[in-house]
């Protein structure tokens, strides 16, 4: 069981909410959280901390419907300055459907893994606690930020959501309620409203994932949660996530280009309160993506624990990115240009470069030989 004291638990609960004001939670002395900072895999980093400062902004949330190319999907060329408003309204509905399916796959994955580790009865208790303590208290704020509803409509949606949650709890299954699941009338909404709904669906998805993770932290500590996430994403969720994005957004292209487009429309990393990214392809088979803002880094730095930010980054991001890269091409090379700890908050949170190995590379994979070493 976790030996995190009550004060630390309360602070963690507040600072790990999506959109938390980190300045309010800034710790002069690092928060005392038990964690193993020695026994974890550190991936090689190309450059030293302090090299890459934040440049540019995340264009995906820019809304400019008047000059939209009305993309039906993302089967066309990579666009480093992609705006979600570049998609047609039908494509944005597909993006929302993609986000909903992504949400369901993630939550079912968490539920299955929790049941395997703790038993099905504990899984039901954990998901009920996650909804009661984390998701529902944040729901009104998410609705007000993204859904453009009146007070009466917002309260009606919250009541409807609570009723659905209670019904699914009573039925004994996994709670998959999603107020951002597209409805028939959404097809009549403006493009601006659909983009906001897509961004809101991302915030809801993050809150749901975080709610499960937080319960595990409170029960068994950070190390258990880090190990849990590593296994869950690398073994269970990544193939499904790649398939979901490919089907709904028609992602295509050469391997690096396709993976760059995959990342741009990944519902777990849409722009907003948690993430801000930039994307570029300086050469045909070279892609670079940068997190200028990352909720995990911001949280741990606010708590005075950049050392935990380092562990969190190494135990979650590389596994997901490297494994997905291999799905696109076993010879796709992933290089970490920057990763926590940072020298200052003006520095990027992390930076990654994708390329394709040639036959001179000692890790080149010949057809039929399997995967490259990581």
Please provide the spans of the model-predicted regions.
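N-terminal accessory segment detector
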Residues: 2-288, 295, 299-316, 326-349, ...
């Amino acid at each position: 069981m976790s030996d995190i004291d009550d004060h630390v638990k309360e602070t963690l609960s507040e600072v790990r909410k999506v959109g938390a004001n980190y300045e309010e939670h800034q710790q002069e002395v690092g928060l005392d959280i038990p964690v193993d900072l020695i026994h974890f895999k550190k991936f090689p980093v190309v450059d030293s901390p302090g090299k890459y400062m934040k440049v540019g902004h995340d264009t995906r949330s820019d809304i400019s419907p008047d000059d939209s190319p009305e993309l039906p999907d993302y089967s066309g060329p990579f666009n480093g300055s992609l705006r979600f408003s570049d998609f047609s309204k039908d494509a944005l509905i597909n993006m929302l459907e993609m986000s909903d399916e992504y949400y369901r796959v993630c939550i079912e994955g968490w539920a299955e893994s929790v049941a395997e580790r703790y038993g099905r009865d504990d899984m039901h208790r954990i998901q009920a606690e996650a909804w009661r303590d984390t998701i529902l208290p944040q729901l009104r704020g998410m609705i007000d930020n993204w859904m453009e509803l009146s007070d009466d409509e917002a309260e009606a949606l919250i009541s409807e959501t609570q009723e659905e949650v209670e019904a699914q709890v009573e039925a004994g299954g996994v709670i998959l309620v999603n107020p951002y699941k597209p409805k028939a009338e959404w097809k009549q909404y403006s493009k601006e409203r659909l983009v906001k709904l897509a961004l809101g669906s991302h915030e809801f998805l993050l809150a749901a994932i975080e709610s499960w993770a937080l319960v595990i932290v409170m029960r068994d500590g950070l190390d258990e949660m880090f190990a849990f996430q590593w296994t869950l994403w690398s073994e269970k969720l990544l193939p499904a996530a790649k398939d979901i994005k490919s089907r709904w957004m028609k992602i295509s292209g050469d391997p690096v280009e396709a993976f760059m487009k995959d990342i741009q429309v990944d519902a777990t990393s849409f722009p907003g309160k948690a993430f801000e990214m930039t994307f570029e392809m300086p050469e045909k088979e070279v892609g670079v993506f940068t997190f200028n803002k990352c909720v995990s880094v911001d949280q741990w730095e606010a708590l005075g624990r950049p050392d935990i930010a380092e562990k969190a980054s190494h135990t979650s991001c590389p596994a997901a990115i490297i494994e997905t890269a291999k799905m696109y091409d076993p010879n796709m090379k992933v290089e970490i240009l920057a990763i926590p700890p940072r020298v200052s908050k003006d520095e990027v949170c992390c930076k990654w470069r994708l390329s394709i190995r040639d036959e001179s590379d000692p890790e080149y994979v010949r057809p039929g030989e399997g995967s490259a070493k990581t």
